[in-house]
Amino acid sequence: MSEIIRVPDIGGDGEVIELLVKTGDLIEVEQGLVVLESAKASMEVPSPKAGVVKSVSVKLGDKLKEGDAIIELEPAAGAAAAPAEAAAVPAAPTQAVDEAEAPSPGASATPAPAAASQEVRVPDIGSAGKARVIEVLVKAGDQVQAEQSLIVLESDKASMEIPSPASGVVESVAIQLNAEVGTGDLILTLRTTGAQAQPTAPAAAAAASPAPAPLAPAAAGPQEVKVPDIGSAGKARVIEVLVKAGDQVQAEQSLIVLESDKASMEIPSPAAGVVESVAVQLNAEVGTGDQILTLRVAGAAPSGPRARGSPGQAAAAPGAAPAPAPVGAPSRNGAKVHAGPAVRQLAREFGVELAAINSTGPRGRILKEDVQAYVKAMMQKAKEAPAAGAASGAGIPPIPPVDFAKYGEIEEVPMTRLMQIGATNLHRSWLNVPHVTQFESADITELEAFRVAQKAVAEKAGVKLTVLPLLLKACAYLLKELPDFNSSLAPSGQALIRKKYVHIGFAVDTPDGLLVPVIRNVDQKSLLQLAAEAAELAEKARSKKLGADAMQGACFTISSLGHIGGTAFTPIVNAPEVAILGVSKASMQPVWDGKAFQPRLMLPLSLSYDHRVINGAAAARFTKRLGDLLADIRAILL
């Protein structure tokens, strides 16, 4: 049978600033249903039972009071109700502190005379002593109503609105934004309109309230600092340890941050001293009375009684650990971040700093939707980062956009996905690898004669023997002879990773862009096997049937433009490889043999290399040896 879950006793009314559940949700005992905010505190209202939400009776912005319906709940079988006191105090630590620090206008002054000027002063703001004006809500000439907020103050423990004690017209405002004010400081002068004024003078509060008992002086020597009363939460998790052994701390300096299912709170030091040892660890569960640390305090003079209503008076030295204060993550300008426990937990799960999030809730409060929107924006930004990096060159000033249409007719043709990926990879390699290119010409007159002589044998085997298999075989031989060319730079930049295998990629020009299939174990295959595999991979690349795994794992790359033309070019190293061989069109050239010029078929070679790994002499030796091998391929057999 369904049950209506109602607002417990919250000491007044509150505005719904967050809905934490929706129809159909399966909820647990003590799971938050809504977050309410009153003039003095914000609090989560938990569910007293587990079950399924049948309907939600409230919406954002609703004003709720004790007994108002929140949801209709279909209890789970055998679900036990939560303790009554837990329901009655939805957010004990947060509410208790905020109420303790918030002013109570009805308990601190004598009534103002009707139809007369009245000075409105800062009421007793408790142990905070001083607070900063973070909002001024009225100006001279404004008509205000009794209980209308005049300013918003923020101390290190709470933020609070100061209400008007009576209706009237603001004659003058005595404070400014960001000013530090204390109990009894003048806020404004109000000309009342004959309504019964509410008390404001702080002296009355001081007279009505008994002075606190004198506090004992802090004795010199070690003192155990324990977890104070953390209310109905019972246990809380240590989410931050702010000090370590040997640290010098001041009185009221935060030591640890605790979090329960209802609130986050900082535990301050009761006295100044040096931390001797820390007894708690990150993520430990602690409760009231558990030891936090041992503090060696210096002897201090006893503090006398302090009248809470006296402005400008120094705070008494604490004799026991004070009540924990709600945590607000500091924003960039030093202000506190306002968010409920559920929102803080969500932010931690995403690894997000609350201070970086723009708030959309009432009075600057961060909502779950704000966290989700921030995470979504960051993910989109990360997704666009590679493209942005490729466009701008990772810090290099980008080329300014040009409106080409003003010069004549244009057509914008989208790049294929393959072209986009290739552009990003090539740009990354160009930016990260210090390129140098070594040029050489190889005499392949005899090699070409050998290739032509073997055409019939190759055709009988069903393959076409081109120069590429011969280049693959010669390069594989050199990669084993000169192992630095068959390596990659370690991520640390302090070592080389030498590969014991010889996999070589070769560039294939396709209608959609450049592809580089990889032939594995080139050193272990015959010329005819290499010719067959190269032809098969090239066909797959052109017909879009080449798998991703067929383009991975290369140690070295050959890019041949011999079938097109050209005398030389500077290929880009395919990182993390350290070298790439460019091959241009062979041509007959006159070569001096010591007696006369002889016609020889010369093949231009262009070796680009990573200068972090390969030096110029090594590159020259590589191209020289490659030229020798191509001039007499029989040397490979030795």
From Swiss-Prot:
Alphabetically ordered keywords of this record: Acyltransferase, Lipoyl, Repeat, Transferase
Record has Repeat as a keyword: yes
Low complexity: bias regions: 90-117, 301-320
Domain Peripheral subunit-binding (PSBD), first and last residues per copy: 338-375
Cofactor: (R)-lipoate
Residues the record lists as N6-lipoyllysine modifications: K40, K157, K262
Active site: H611
Source domain of life: Bacteria
EC number(s) from the headed UniProt entry: 2.3.1.12
CDD domains: lipoyl_domain
Start and end residues of each stretch annotated as Catalytic: 382-638
Ranges of residues in domain Lipoyl-binding: 2-74, 117-191, 222-296
Gene Ontology terms for molecular function: dihydrolipoyllysine-residue acetyltransferase activity; lipoic acid binding
UniProt cross-references to InterPro entries, sorted A to Z: 2-oxoA_DH_lipoyl-BS, 2-oxoacid_DH_actylTfrase, 2-oxoacid_DH_E2_comp, AcTrfase_Pyrv_DH_cplx, Biotin_lipoyl, CAT-like_dom_sf, E3-bd_dom_sf, PSBD
Region span, Disordered: 90-119, 201-220, 301-336
GO CC annotation, single: pyruvate dehydrogenase complex
Reaction(s) catalysed by this chain's protein: N(6)-[(R)-dihydrolipoyl]-L-lysyl-[protein] + acetyl-CoA = N(6)-[(R)-S(8)-acetyldihydrolipoyl]-L-lysyl-[protein] + CoA
Any GO BP: pyruvate decarboxylation to acetyl-CoA
Family, per entry: Belongs to the 2-oxoacid dehydrogenase family.
Chain's role: The pyruvate dehydrogenase complex catalyzes the overall conversion of pyruvate to acetyl-CoA and CO(2). It contains multiple copies of three enzymatic components: pyruvate dehydrogenase (E1), dihydrolipoamide acetyltransferase (E2) and lipoamide dehydrogenase (E3).
Subunit structure: Forms a 24-polypeptide structural core with octahedral symmetry.
Protein name: Dihydrolipoyllysine-residue acetyltransferase component of pyruvate dehydrogenase complex
